[in-house]
């Protein structure tokens, strides 16, 4: 089978301009304050590929970093942040338009302190994404997100890391010990370190968790993220002029075949779920 052409969409920087308090599994020595000059250097080095960047707005006190990101035409995302609701709303007012893995590595939703999650659930100027594995968020939270925002503003992501798909056991990842167990990947501290989720699994889960239809769930994994990344004219849809990146699912939502730019890239065993 000929090797299919690569189909990169963009580069997303999930660091280093994040909060140490909400670093999750990120490498703490690499975390830095949001720096407009460094962001400009990264954008230049990326030669147009850097289109999404996470940052902690509470660390960008004068909002100079956000202004730089917006001026560069890069999508500013609230992620790995301990921002208050008010700080999150000021960031949205300033041009931030997305939240990375909603509810994870961010200030929580509380009835007197809505946090970043509260801001993103109630302000339709911004889009959100969720890790629908039933571990990063409870199925009831998935239902809450869909009820508040609807499927058109919510992207499904995996947050999968290199050990995803490996048997249960201990591994080394980016110089740290991690454990794969019970469908999760954790650091020695017990903190989640990415997921074992596949995107077809996310689609199946969101249908089960929320009761939405297959077409809506598939849109959350295709058209919605393509729109967020600014590539919806050629990705995330089947239409003349769009890239022929296709996935064939069986009746249960498991991947059977994939095509990249029209080239068959994967074929599962006949009659078996992948």
Where are each of the predicted segments found?
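Short, function-defining helix-loop hinge/capping sites that tune catalysis or transport
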Residues: 109, 167, 173, 253, ...
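Structured loop/turn residues at beta-strand edges in well-structured enzyme cores
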Residues: 6, 48, 94, 152, ...
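Divalent-metal coordination cores built from histidine and acidic residues
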Residues: 1-49
């Amino acid at each position: 089978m000929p090797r299919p052409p690569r189909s990169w969409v963009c580069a997303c920087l999930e660091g280093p301009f994040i909060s140490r308090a909400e670093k999750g599994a990120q490498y703490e020595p690499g975390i830095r304050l949001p720096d407009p000059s460094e962001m400009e250097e990264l954008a230049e080095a990326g030669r147009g590929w850097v289109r999404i960047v996470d940052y902690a707005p509470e660390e960008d006190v004068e909002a100079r970093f956000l202004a730089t990101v917006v001026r560069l035409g890069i999508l500013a995302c609230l992620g790995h942040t301990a921002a208050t609701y008010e700080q999150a709303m000021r960031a949205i007012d300033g041009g931030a338009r997305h939240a990375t893995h909603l509810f994870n590595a961010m200030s929580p939703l509380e009835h007197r302190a809505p946090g970043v999650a509260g801001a993103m659930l109630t302000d339709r100027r911004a889009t959100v994404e969720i890790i629908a594995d039933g571990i990063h968020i409870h199925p009831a939270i998935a239902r809450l997100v869909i009820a508040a925002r609807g499927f058109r503003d919510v992207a499904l992501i995996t947050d999968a890391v290199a050990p995803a798909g490996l048997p249960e056991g201990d591994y080394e990842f980016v110089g740290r010990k991690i454990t794969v167990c019970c469908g999760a990947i954790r650091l020695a501290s017990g903190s989640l370190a990415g997921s074992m989720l596949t995107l077809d699994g996310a689609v199946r889960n969101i249908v089960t968790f929320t009761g939405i239809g297959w077409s809506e769930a598939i849109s959350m994994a295709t058209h919605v993220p393509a729109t967020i990344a600014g590539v919806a004219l050629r990705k995330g849809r089947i239409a003349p002029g769009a890239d022929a990146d296709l996935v064939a699912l069986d009746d249960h939502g498991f991947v059977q075949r994939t095509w990249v730019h029209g080239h068959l890239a994967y074929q599962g065993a006949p009659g078996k779920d992948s």
